[in-house]
Amino acid sequence: MKVVMVVNKRQLEVQKISTADEQRIIRQLKQVYSQTSKDCAAKIQELSMRTDLENIQSIVYQKQYQEAIKKQIDGILNDLNSKSFANIADYLGQCYETGFIGTLYDLQGQGIPLCFPINQEDVVQALQVDSKISQGLYQRMGEDTNHLKKSIKAELSRGISNGSSWNMVAGKIASGMNSPFDKAYKRAVVIARTEGHRVQQQSTLHCQKRAKSQGADVLKQWDSTLDGVTRPTHRELDGQIREIDEPFEVAGMKAMYPGAFGNPGEDCNCRCCLLQ
């Protein structure tokens, strides 16, 4: 069944909170990656202070120094991974609370005065188990950090073989739209945005199920953000209504809530919402 439904005031309030939380985590990630890129560049630029190395007069010594720099960068990037994970993990926990409490708030506005606590086992399930896009969050971020390490080391080696100055190498690694750090930052934002969205929609479903179990007559509805970049499948899903335990269906695919297809082409950067 598909109907046209106007998002109510309380649902809009919850969506605004979600948007503000997402913007906050993006700012935090940008700050972390920006500082790390500066730290790496500073380590590399230390070589430019050594006039005996600038013209590659001592190739053997320079190679040894290069390896030492790589080890120091490894330490900086491991710290980056820990900070990024901590920020995103906190954000995902907030997403679950927003989705669950926001659903209760909306149901009360619709004349269903229910109140029950969040089930912590459901939180663990949503944050640590049910990521269907690929591996767990920490493993994915660790792989991204390892890729960043390899990219930076490759740039270091390439700079040496090309006869570039250390300042030039540092600039290429730390800045620019195609720098390793810029690519890694964008990847971290996609992970945070996609996982945060999935967690919030799943917590909404958890709350809907709890309400249903306590006797509330609740149905769920898919609400798509309709504009020029909306996926055709999500446009088709817009307005579909299902029983709480029934999946939404489109193009041979099924999902219990937005962000739950398990297909990156459907889930990454999804902006759809689950309403009741």
What are the residue ranges of the model-derived segments?
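N-terminal leader/targeting and assembly helices and adjacent pre-domain segments
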Residues: 1-182
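Acidic, glycine-rich two-metal-ion catalytic cores of nucleic acid-processing enzymes
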Residues: 183-276
